[in-house]
Amino acid sequence: MTSRGMKRRDLHLIFIIVIAAMEMFPVVANCQVKRALLVGISNYSSNRVTQWTDIHGANDVELLASTLKSQRFKITKVTNQQATAKRIRKELASLVKSCRAGDVVYIHFSGHGQPVEDQNKDEADGWDEAIIPYDAQKVYSKGKYEGANHILDDELSSFFSQIRTKVGAKGFLCVVIDACHSGGASRGEEMEEDEEIFSRGTRDGFSSTRKPYRPPVNTNGHFVINSSATQSGIVILEACRSYQSNYEIKQDGQYYGPLSYYINKTLKSSQLLKSLSWVQVVKRLMDGDRRLTKQNMVIESSLK
């Protein structure tokens, strides 16, 4: 065999070995997984004991699922009667367990929110914030319902911290809360005549002492979350400030949470990346909607 033939054979063998190695041990870049947990509740009133009004949180989930799927996210959807406190906690715990280094994680909640009287005295204003699962009751009742199904911000923060640690510095966590921890009865002058008012949240705090909820007026719209060399970057987006109401908007005959709608619109043409650039686009769109002049999106982020 000529030296040229031997070289060709050797190159062919090397090529086969490289391909086999790539299949057995994929490069790290290809190991990144995009994961999304989407929770949305519309039909609260079908569980009459909870006393919550119907909204359109499940619409947000369906809207976003299609867009995130096009960006190759592995999607878990939990809506309406499925979205109990037990199920939401189970899915969050499962997400923590399944995450790997370098993953991109998106968590979305569309539903009601409520302020809850602070029990461990770690809140300056005396109130925690809670997302409201399908089976969380609106009113405190001693010995009957004392808030077990409210999912507090402290509990959510623990899940978020665990995810940030699992995905590490090369990963990313984005959290969207299209709810509200206040609520109102009217929106303003930019509504269409045939447009109903759907507000997410309530002004009634969940309190064993019937303590009235009086949120401080903080006009800061951007808060800094501490960064860590061993944890991923994080962005948390909220539909409005603590003293404002979050009103649904009507688009193409359907009602959506405004934050969800404009995130979806932005992600139609932008990738969900570890960056604030696409977040700023969402903010500009919300600021430009005349129906939303009385609410301001809030950004919490460890990114610079």
Where are these regions (language model features)?
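Bacterial N-terminal signal peptides that target proteins for export
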Residues: 2-15
